[in-house]
Amino acid sequence: MSRSNSIYTEDIEMYPTHNEQHLTREYTKPDGQTKSEKLNFEGAYINSHGTLSKTTTREIEGDLDSETSSHSSDDKVDPTQQITAETKAPYTLLSYGQKWGMVAILTMCGFWSSLGSPIYYPALRQLEKQFNVDENMVNVTVVVYLLFQGISPTVSGGLADCFGRRPIILAGMLIYVIASIGLACAPSYGVIIFLRCIQSIGISPTIAISSGVVGDFTLKHERGTFVGATSGFVLLGQCFGSLIGAVLTARWDWRAIFWFLTIGCGSCFLIAFLILPETKRTIAGNLSIKPKRFINRAPIFLLGPVRRRFKYDNPDYETLDPTIPKLDLSSAGKILVLPEIILSLFPSGLLFAMWTLMLSSISSGLSVAPYNYHLVIIGVCYLPGGIGGLMGSFFTGRIIDMYFKRKIKKFEQDKANGLIPQDAEINMFKVRLVCLLPQNFLAVVAYLLFGWSIDKGWRIESILITSFVCSYCAMSTLSTSTTLLVDLYPTKSSTASSCFNFVRCSLSTIFMGCFAKMKAAMTVGGTFTFLCALVFFFNFLMFIPMKYGMKWREDRLLKQQRQSWLNTLAVKAKKGTKRDQNDNHN
């Protein structure tokens, strides 16, 4: 009696949410019976179309002689059937809960970057008196922090994409702690300006690199939720910083602010050193591969249960990105000058710069008539903005993920029906930016009302409500823009994220530097009216990349491929000419 194996393979297209644990598939066994089987999608991977797929191979072993003789003999033996499933290695070994744990760790690291600027605002008046400087001079320390907050990530992002996320984050936090100690003990105003630059250079890259980390362990259908949450939670320091700074300054003095930053960031540094894993896919794959360099290894992976959970003894080497990373410190600039990128980011950066002015206006506007609020009460007035930012980062991520799933499903259906070419790619600019437009136009109205509320001394409720809406829109804008960049450049996600960081911080620096003169010339209400008009106009520019962005990218790719082909031909021709010359010489 002979035995035979029957093998077939199927490719399953899936669009699961985190609570869809299985899919059911039907198949026919050798005895003719139809069976159903639940398939776990832990081994799912992203296919060339950007959708989640899983390849399952079943081997059905049975007694085929018994099956063929079943019609001629009643004394037959039931076939022994064995079903095994072989799947591709999972994209990441992190569970859904562990992904949120990573978001918490990244928020803990990057929070100190956004906190470093607003926590300093309540101390400005004390610095003026202690060091005998005027308002313009004391604002220099605010401007230089914002300036290096935009410049530093464009360099550090390239380092993180080359050498790994973990060492750059840890190095930045350590520099921040050392600079904060120096600021707490600073003897002169010149030292404060210098150390504020160092402080910003150290911690600023953590925001962009955090988005790169999230891009390492998420797929497109879930990326909006996690990137949005990380980006939004990290920047909540700008909402609550003034409240914390006001309490510390009122209870002690301005030096207490920097001791607080030293202790807080130092504690987070120790936690991150112990548990933050390396996620760069060229180094760690799906987290099952042990990094070669010691600095890329988290000590927690020395524990037996953690090693077994992340398969350190049986790594999935096929998940290792074969791309050899090359250090290119100008890569952020090369991305930023692309027309579809700058047209997508500039309106959002302008909106975010207005949010920075709004936070500054609350501090300065509520401290004078007709409000004359105490420093701590002003800090409490930042709470609605903090809550709005928290809601904006959380809900927007889920909204853009839901919209992406719906659009990719329709896209695949149209492709299957022959309505679009099989090699077509979904328009990521349109899928992401269409979610950005409503909140950007809503923000124009909110900022306009906020500016005139401060200017005319309207009831405090109007200021609190509009600051809530403005913060919601600002965090929504940040989440969507960052997600778009990670989608477009998954292998350079830290560098790409730093582009928006550069745009928003550069614009914030310019407007903060000009804000005092603009208020003197146009009043607060007039200043916000002018900026709202700019945002309203530039919002329409986003329709250009929505329509032409993918075409421009495809044209550049074809041009690069053509140039590469010509270079290859030139090299071969040169070698052939040299060979002919050698033959003639011989």
From Swiss-Prot:
Residues 1-44, 61-82 are annotated as: Disordered. GO terms for molecular function: monocarboxylic acid transmembrane transporter activity; threonine efflux transmembrane transporter activity; transmembrane transporter activity; xenobiotic transmembrane transporter activity. Residues 121-139, 188, 247-255, 356-374, 455-459, 545-586 are cytoplasmic. Pfam families: MFS_1. Residues 1-99, 161-166, 210-225, 277-334, 396-433, 481-523 are extracellular. It comes from the Eukaryota. Its main location: membrane. GO terms for biological process: amino acid export across plasma membrane; monocarboxylic acid transport; transmembrane transport. Gene3D superfamilies: MFS general substrate transporter like domains. Keywords: Membrane, Transmembrane, Transmembrane helix, Transport. It is found in: Membrane. CDD domains: MFS_Tpo1_MDR_like. It is a multi-pass membrane protein. Belongs to the major facilitator superfamily. CAR1 family. Probable transporter that confers resistance to short-chain monocarboxylic acids and quinidine. This is Probable transporter AQR1. It comes from Saccharomyces cerevisiae (strain ATCC 204508 / S288c).
